[in-house]
Amino acid sequence: MSPDLLGAVLVAAGYLAGSIPFGVVLGRLVLGVDVRTVGSGNIGATNVARAGGKKMGVLVLVLDAAKAIVPILLARRLLAGAPHAEAWSTAVAVAAFVGHLFPVWLGFKGGKGVATGLGIFAVLAPWAALAGLVGYAVAYGLTRISSVGSLTGTALCAAGGFATYGVRHPVPWAGLAIALLIFLRHRENIRRLVRGEEKKV
């Protein structure tokens, strides 16, 4: 199999991995509920934590991050030394993220992408991911509002990508696209923040 064909296969596999709705699966298997019908209706870690406690939320966060981390690491291993290996690995990362936002298994109605995005940055730009985690912790600690922490961390991850790679590498631009999609997914949260109606967690 040619490197480009293998890269395309890995991109498709990345999308399918990203589409796995761990929040929904664990909600049904462990909690006996469909998390899409409780709280905010989101399938991500924050809403799972509302439905089943912090431990369940952390588990979903880790799994949602892992479904991006594993495909990226696999792509890097299988494409090591091949032409455009870094570009293909970045494409796999984006595909996993798109899978989380638009999962084929849920009629293309997915989550907001924060944990999956964090997993991507953890592999492609670890220092940016660390900056994002610190930013999340500080912003959430000050406000007790999850969306404020998530958006702060996302912005720092995107900035950290450019600080790590500059502007001539595909990773920071992919990171910027991911950050913009996360902000777009949080548009209702942003509106509530502006109105002072966003709930604390």
UniProtKB/Swiss-Prot annotation:
The chain crosses the membrane at residues 5-25, 55-75, 88-108, 118-138, 164-184. It is an enzyme of class 2 (transferase). It is a multi-pass membrane protein. It catalyses: an acyl phosphate + sn-glycerol 3-phosphate = a 1-acyl-sn-glycero-3-phosphate + phosphate. GO terms for biological process: phospholipid biosynthetic process. Its main location: membrane. SMART domains: G3P_acyltransf (SM01207). It comes from the Bacteria. GO terms for molecular function: acyl-phosphate glycerol-3-phosphate acyltransferase activity. It is found in: Cell inner membrane. GO terms for cellular component: plasma membrane. InterPro entries: G3P_acylTferase_PlsY. Its EC number is 2.3.1.275. Pathway: Lipid metabolism; phospholipid metabolism. It holds the Pfam family G3P_acyltransf. Keywords: Cell inner membrane, Cell membrane, Lipid biosynthesis, Lipid metabolism, Membrane, Phospholipid biosynthesis, Phospholipid metabolism, Transferase, Transmembrane, Transmembrane helix. Catalyzes the transfer of an acyl group from acyl-phosphate (acyl-PO(4)) to glycerol-3-phosphate (G3P) to form lysophosphatidic acid (LPA). This enzyme utilizes acyl-phosphate as fatty acyl donor, but not acyl-CoA or acyl-ACP. Belongs to the PlsY family. Probably interacts with PlsX. This is Glycerol-3-phosphate acyltransferase. The gene is plsY.
